[in-house]
């Protein structure tokens, strides 16, 4: 059964930037004689969250409050500095559609690459099904993504990222990156993914969206949980949610 457990989790960033988690950077620093202690900033501060099947959790807060960073911790992109993280179930992190894509590769090869990164076997049937969803000309599969317009590129990346259901779905804002002629179809596909997932966590500035779609809202500020607002459903519709009243 899908489950997320975070207990007293902290994440410290090197002060010179989050990208410097790399081993290469550390080795170069040592060769340059910069082996002293690195100054850090605490991005996630002592956070505990428990979620089981049926949970729809919204992450709210101002820019820099830690919403996106917390999603990346849960997805395994960043290692926690301290605390305990336990994830049970298949995780789909929709945090950046272009992550892992190579614009110099042809479209079909990019689809296969992205599927492998997500742990899926890119069979011909699966690639063809993904391509059919994009509604793009069949011949474009053999063109490098660099030749695609931004709208066409997003169609390919969106169709690939959302091709399979997941136990745990992580969303950094509600996806609205596809062109206008494709948006309704993409919205329905995303809603289906959300309904199929056992646990959904979405970070957003849109309070109305969170209140409409979530069972609880976790309010963050400076990497800390300020409070958690519980909500409940009064409708058979999966998104017919409203706040509990005392």
Report the location of each language-model feature.
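Pre-NBD coupling/linker segments of ABC/ABC-like ATPases
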Residues: 2-42, 237-244
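ABC ATPase nucleotide-binding domain signature region
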Residues: 5-7, 11-14, 53-58, 62-118
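H-loop/switch region of ABC-family ATPase nucleotide-binding domains
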Residues: 204-205
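Conserved N-terminal flank of the Walker A/P-loop in ABC nucleotide-binding domains
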Residues: 40, 47, 55-56
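ABC-family P-loop ATPase nucleotide-binding domains
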Residues: 38-40, 90, 95-156, 160-168, ...
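Helical segment within the ABC ATPase nucleotide-binding domain
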Residues: 183-196
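Conserved catalytic segment of ABC-fold P-loop ATPases
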Residues: 212-219
């Amino acid at each position: 059964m899908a489950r997320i457990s975070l207990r007293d989790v902290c994440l410290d960033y090197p002060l010179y930037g989050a990208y410097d988690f790399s081993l290469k950077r550390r080795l170069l620093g040592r060769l340059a004689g910069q082996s002293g202690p690195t100054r850090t900033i605490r991005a996630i501060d002592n956070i505990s969250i428990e979620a089981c099947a049926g949970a729809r959790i919204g992450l709210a807060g101002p820019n820099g409050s830690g919403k996106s960073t917390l999603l990346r911790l849960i997805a395994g992109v960043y290692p926690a500095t301290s605390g305990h993280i336990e994830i049970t179930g298949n995780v789909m992190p929709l945090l950046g559609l272009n992550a892992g894509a190579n614009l110099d590769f042809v479209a079909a090869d990019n689809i296969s690459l992205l599927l492998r990164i997500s742990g899926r076997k890119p069979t011909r049937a699966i690639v063809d099904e993904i391509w059919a969803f994009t509604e793009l000309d069949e011949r474009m599969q053999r063109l490098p993504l660099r030749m695609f317009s931004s709208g066409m590129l997003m169609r390919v990346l969106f169709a690939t990222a959302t091709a399979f259901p997941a136990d745990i779905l992580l969303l950094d804002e509600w996806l609205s990156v596809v062109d206008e002629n494709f948006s309704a179809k993409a919205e329905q596909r995303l809603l289906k993914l959300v309904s199929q997932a056992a646990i959904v966590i979405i970070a957003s500035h849109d309070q109305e969206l969170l209140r409409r779609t979530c069972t609880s809202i976790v309010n963050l500020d400076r990497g800390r949980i300020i409070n958690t607002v519980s909500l409940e459903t009064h409708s058979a519709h999966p998104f017919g949610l409203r706040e509990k009243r005392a």
